């Protein structure tokens, strides 16, 4: 009986100790990590040369609304989207909007990428999407893939496949 009494008393003392306001602060739940390329994920760090040999990096994009476009010369929907992105770049560029196109290089180009861009009237930076770049953006499941990041560098829209310029502009306007 005495042994039970001591056991209950010990458990009670230790149990109350856990409720002490002066005990170590409660652990905060760990924030769930968001995978690259998922809504809410940050703009990955990158530094690449564009097709003209100019350096382009994520550091250059701080504080801007950013549209990242993964494309290929053989991709018909990409060819239809890029002139619209150029129009948005011309319209909103002065307000802190940037566009970077990453050429998906897993298949043979149907034409020289620089000539392709010139023919479409694209003046925003275009670079090659190496395996490392594609990984940093969470992998690319299809072309075109468009990602829109807000001024804080957080992914707020991801579209796989063709999208009309007007729909993209509706995403951009509140961010700019």
Please place each PLM-identified region on the residue numbering:
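Structural microenvironment flanking redox-active thiols in thiol-disulfide oxidoreductases
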Residues: 79-120, 129-136
